[in-house]
Amino acid sequence: MKPTRVPNNPCFSSGPCAKHPGYSIEELKDTPFGRSHRSNLGKEKLAEAIKKTRDMLGLPDDYLVGIVPASDTGAFEMCLWSMLGCRGVDVLVWESFSKGWATDITKQLKLKDVRVFEAEYGKLPDLKKVDFKNDVVFVWNGTTSGVKVPNGDWIPENREGLTLCDATSAIFAMDIPYHKLDVITFSWQKVLGGEGAHGMLILSPRAVQRLESYTPAWPLPKIFRLTKGGKLNKKIFEGSTINTPSMLANEDWLATLKWAESVGGLKPLIQRTNDNLAVFEAFVAKNNWIHFLAETKEIRSSTSVCFKVDLSDEKLKELIKTLEKEKVAYDIGSYRDAPSGLRIWCGATVEKEDLQCLCEWIEWAYNLVK
């Protein structure tokens, strides 16, 4: 029977993700429109975003946080181009974005001493094969496959190389051992539902040391430059951005952090995400026609949850269109490079009740189109 209730928020996209519950444009009323980001007020606003992010995450005291251009992609690229090349590189690939990093390292930077460990969608490469004498490049959560690393146990405390981690769809949703990561990047529009175009860059003291002791052989564009005169440009990590940010997007980020504080901070955010995943675990357990793409529970993402559905590609498209037409779910098709299926965002800004409601609609639509 066709469900009678609909989700309060039908936005289940994996980026940009749903705004937090109760979101209102009123929350942006203190945006310093028309003011320079270099003014005292502008710098204060950006520094506030940096400090509140650091405090919410509980980062080590000696780690630096900065706002950089071009979303998570910009943040991660600037580190690949600025830090790699002085030792071997191990790259872990198991979905589209991690494959993109491997392509940049081998085809754009053209580094020679590179080992690529690749697994198909739904699986992880063998983490035991990683050599931490090399720099290690990986994503914490594979946004396009719904597969994450199980934990940080495979990363040694003492390592010669740097660990560079794209954590954009994991941070604020998963327990991450920051001290095992030298570079951490993410964007505002994922777990907390901020706006696009801005990246956040977190550096360990070891990453800073690399920047100050190694100069790549290739030219670096202005928006990738993290040093001045051989020293780290610390102003980037105090609110003086490389180029002009959107003060409106920054205000929106401050609003998301305020909401995150209101629900209790990091641990409740992680719990909300896990509770959301549990809705689908129950749904998959009682329906034999839908399956997680991730092969095992320990590597199953709790944010970008990916499914295989026992339907032809045409019927699957029909299911997705039906749910969009009914205004119950937007943007839930799998990523263009991934196996056909569903990808449903379960991060902290999504309400559990909306997912429970969505499950009823997916079941109805499946029976309608099959």
Swiss-Prot record:
Pathway: Amino-acid biosynthesis; L-serine biosynthesis; L-serine from 3-phospho-D-glycerate: step 2/3; Cofactor biosynthesis; pyridoxine 5'-phosphate biosynthesis; pyridoxine 5'-phosphate from D-erythrose 4-phosphate: step 3/5. Its EC number is 2.6.1.52. It catalyses: O-phospho-L-serine + 2-oxoglutarate = 3-phosphooxypyruvate + L-glutamate; 4-(phosphooxy)-L-threonine + 2-oxoglutarate = (R)-3-hydroxy-2-oxo-4-phosphooxybutanoate + L-glutamate. The modification N6-(pyridoxal phosphate)lysine is found at K190. The keyword Transferase applies. One of its GO terms (biological process) is pyridoxine biosynthetic process. It comes from the Archaea. The keyword Isomerase does not apply. GO terms for molecular function: O-phospho-L-serine:2-oxoglutarate aminotransferase activity; pyridoxal phosphate binding. Its main location: cytoplasm. It is found in: Cytoplasm. Pyridoxal 5'-phosphate binds at W101, T143, D166, Q189, N243, T244. Its cofactor is pyridoxal 5'-phosphate. It is an enzyme of class 2 (transferase). SUPFAM superfamilies: PLP-dependent transferases. L-glutamate binds at R38. Keywords: Amino-acid biosynthesis, Aminotransferase, Cytoplasm, Pyridoxal phosphate, Pyridoxine biosynthesis, Serine biosynthesis, Transferase. Binds 1 pyridoxal phosphate per subunit. One of its GO terms (cellular component) is cytoplasm. Homodimer. HAMAP family: SerC_aminotrans_5 (MF_00160). Catalyzes the reversible conversion of 3-phosphohydroxypyruvate to phosphoserine and of 3-hydroxy-2-oxo-4-phosphonooxybutanoate to phosphohydroxythreonine. Belongs to the class-V pyridoxal-phosphate-dependent aminotransferase family. SerC subfamily. This is Phosphoserine aminotransferase. The gene is serC.
